[in-house]
Curated annotation (Swiss-Prot):
Keywords on record: Protein kinase inhibitor
UniProt biased composition (Low complexity): 198-208
Gene: KRP1
UniProt GO BP: regulation of cell cycle
Highest rank taxon of the organism: Eukaryota
Family: Belongs to the CDI family. ICK/KRP subfamily.
Upper classification of the organism: Eukaryota, Viridiplantae, Streptophyta, Embryophyta, Tracheophyta
Protein name: Cyclin-dependent kinase inhibitor 1
UniProt biased composition (Basic and acidic residues): 160-169
InterPro entries for the chain: CDI_dom (IPR003175), CDI_dom_sf (IPR044898), KRP (IPR044275)
Gene Ontology MF: a single term: cyclin-dependent protein serine/threonine kinase inhibitor activity
Location of the region described as Disordered in the Swiss-Prot/TrEMBL record: 140-212
Any GO CC annotation of this UniProt entry: nucleus
Length: 262
């Protein structure tokens, strides 16, 4: 930038005051100003056109034309674009056969499941019955083996008891609910048949009990301790605590004390 002073002289020779001219870098000329104004006008027109189109799009669109396809779908020709419309949903009546078919298939599956469960239950019951028969047979064999150890004097009674027990322990003679009673009876018999403690067991129990020495032994022990303590006191203080009299030889001289009452 620079400042220039220009002076002009008039025809009469008068000196006119010059005006200060300030030149700024980047000052637009007339042509540049006209071009900038034209560009601004173009931008304003484009913005107004875009806003007009936006307002038209926001307004309720009017259908210009429709084109329907075979599948039920159609295109709506709007003012600015073409809109696709999906076909309408089928009526609920068309779904009823499908639902009925699904229900029928579900019932069939439930029936198959029930049949499978019945087969499984029957198989399980047969397996349980077989296992119960085997367990009862084993119990009867054990009972027979236990009854063989009975003395000869009671052979007739044990034979009748074995026959009765064999008849009672057959699988077909009682219901499954009676098995628990039989087991409880066998357990009670085993508890009752436990042997009594022997003499060796009793002696071992006696040996483990704490021993209390007799009164005479306790008295002798304390008497010896008292005698030793009396000897130690007599040797140190020349006084016999057992008889209550002083000794002649010693470091101390004992003098009897007379009470004031006497």
């Amino acid at each position: 930038m620079g400042k220039y002073m220009r002076k002009f002289r008039g025809a009469t020779g008068e000196e006119l005051a010059a005006m200060e001219v300030t030149q700024v870098v980047g000052v637009r000329t007339r042509s540049r100003s006209a071009a900038a104004a034209g560009a601004t006008t173009t931008k304003v027109q484009a913005a107004s056109a875009a806003s007009t189109r936006r307002r038209k799009a926001l307004l309720p669109t009017a259908v210009v034309g429709t084109t329907r396809r075979d599948g039920g779908s159609c295109y709506l020709q709007l003012r600015s674009r073409m809109l696709f419309m999906a076909p309408p949903r089928p009526a609920p009546a068309a779904r009823a056969p499908v639902v009925a078919e699904a229900a029928g298939s579900g019932n069939g599956a439930a029936a198959h499941a029930a049949a499978g469960l019945s087969r499984c239950s029957s198989t399980a019951s047969s397996v349980d019955a077989a296992a119960q028969d085997r367990s009862l047979a084993c119990r009867s064999d054990v009972a027979e083996a236990g009854s063989e150890h009975v003395p000869e004097g009671s052979a007739s009674d044990s034979a009748s008891g074995r026959d009765r027990e064999r008849r009672e322990t057959t699988p077909s003679s009682f219901l499954p609910g009676e098995v628990s009673d039989l087991e409880s009876d066998l357990a009670g018999g085993q508890k009752r048949s436990r042997p009594l403690p022997s003499a060796a067991t009793a002696s071992a129990q006696q040996a483990t009990r704490p021993k209390i020495p007799p009164a005479a032994e306790i008295e002798a022990f304390f008497a010896a301790a008292e005698e030793a303590e009396a000897k130690r006191f007599a040797a140190k203080y020349n006084f016999d605590v057992v008889r209550g009299v002083p000794l002649d030889a010693g470091r101390f001289e004992w003098t009897p004390v007379v009470s004031s009452r006497s």
